[in-house]
Amino acid sequence: MLCNLIHNIHKEGYIIIMISFLLSCIGFAISCSLGIIFLVASLLCIYFFRDPIRIVPEGDHLIISPADGIILNIEQVNSPIDNSTQVLCISIFLNVLNVHVNRIPVSGTIKATEYIPGRFISASLNKSSELNERQRIVIESNVSHHTIIVDQIAGLIARRIVCNAYEGQNVNSGERFGIIRFGSRVNIYLPLNIHISAFKGQTVIGGETILAYLEDYPHKQLTAKFI
């Protein structure tokens, strides 16, 4: 049971959780109430850094949600890497209670990664997409070689973005590529000529919820995998 618990916690949380448990032990040595406070904090850290297994729909034509949260906006904007190109931006807001592990939205190849320094205003605000610290990955899909862009965006509390993806890496939809600590936002930029199934206000699950289809989806049968 302990092994399963550790397996379902993201490695970025190990040190923080160990420190919080150590503080709870010290707290109990000082007073019961102080120990309880640190113990509750430890349990909250475990909850925050949880990394549950997901049932990922399989198919190179699928665009899967890269994060848990709620869709704030779906709008046509200029591409963040090419102002002359219009793309569709789906913005997902993650509150502190959401799973913060981020997943690859489409099978393909990582063409570029970029760290962009910035501010730490509330991730629920649209201007955070342009002003806040963020980490970008650019994916070329296996189907039709579409360009899909994912931005991990820091929020008011989130000050730590982790991205393990690297240029030239072959990736599969649903696999983990990073995490953003505490409240944050993830933007995914898609080509206009695809079939959108997501809608504003929708609650999405990273690695499970289908946001869009790259091709004639009604003629393709879906299967799933556990990741």
From Swiss-Prot:
Cofactor stoichiometry and binding remark: Binds 1 pyruvoyl group covalently per subunit.
Family (UniProt): Belongs to the phosphatidylserine decarboxylase family. PSD-A subfamily.
Residue numbers carrying Pyruvic acid (Ser): 184
Protein task: Catalyzes the formation of phosphatidylethanolamine (PtdEtn) from phosphatidylserine (PtdSer).
Membrane topology according to the record: Peripheral membrane protein
InterPro entries documented for this protein: PS_Dcarbxylase, PSD-A
GO BP terms, alphabetized: phosphatidylethanolamine biosynthetic process
Cell compartment(s), UniProt: Cell membrane
Record-given protein name: Phosphatidylserine decarboxylase proenzyme
MF (Gene Ontology): phosphatidylserine decarboxylase activity
Cofactor: pyruvate
This protein's UniProt keywords: Cell membrane, Decarboxylase, Lipid biosynthesis, Lipid metabolism, Lyase, Membrane, Phospholipid biosynthesis, Phospholipid metabolism, Pyruvate, Zymogen
Modifications after synthesis and translation: Is synthesized initially as an inactive proenzyme. Formation of the active enzyme involves a self-maturation process in which the active site pyruvoyl group is generated from an internal serine residue via an autocatalytic post-translational modification. Two non-identical subunits are generated from the proenzyme in this reaction, and the pyruvate is formed at the N-terminus of the alpha chain, which is derived from the carboxyl end of the proenzyme.
Catalyses which reaction(s): a 1,2-diacyl-sn-glycero-3-phospho-L-serine + H(+) = a 1,2-diacyl-sn-glycero-3-phosphoethanolamine + CO2
UniProt pathway annotation: Phospholipid metabolism; phosphatidylethanolamine biosynthesis; phosphatidylethanolamine from CDP-diacylglycerol: step 2/2
UniProt main location, coarse: membrane
Superkingdom as given in the UniProt entry: Bacteria
Residues with site note (Cleavage (non-hydrolytic)): 183-184
